[in-house]
Amino acid sequence: SYDNSHPFIVETDLGNIKVYGTEFNVRRYTDEQIVRTTLVNGSVGFQSKESVTENYVKIEPGYQISYERGEDVVVKKVKVANEIAWHKQLFCFERCTLEEIMKDVARWYDVKVTFDNENLKGLSFTCTLDRYDEIEKLLRFFEEVYNIEFKIEGKHITIMEQ
């Protein structure tokens, strides 16, 4: 909506996002206790369900509001293109751990991912990958960058050192 005089509210279980005329992205998954709103252009505000005031935290384009239950609202500058890459059917990760990446991969491909070695979770990647590639092709990228291997058994993927 580009009508600033008639904002609308996007409600989540963690808080409300007031939209004042804008292009924005909301990321909220039931298996995570965090909601994120990224502003592309226009204006949005956020108010947690736990807030004792009527005030909304407002952000400018290029910023993201993150809120985790019981914590403070966090505002940070982000690369908007990374946050809305899914519009272009891409995964876009910048300095993300393999654990963070595999959460998104598991959700998208509807698979369960386990790590054979806890140290592998912290491996860091910056990459852009096609969401519609076969999962084997996507995982091959990670195998080529680090000395890791993916064992696929049906809907279960185990990540291990080579």
Outline where the language-model segments fall.
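A residue-level detector for the "anchor" residue at the start of short, highly conserved motifs
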Residues: 1-162
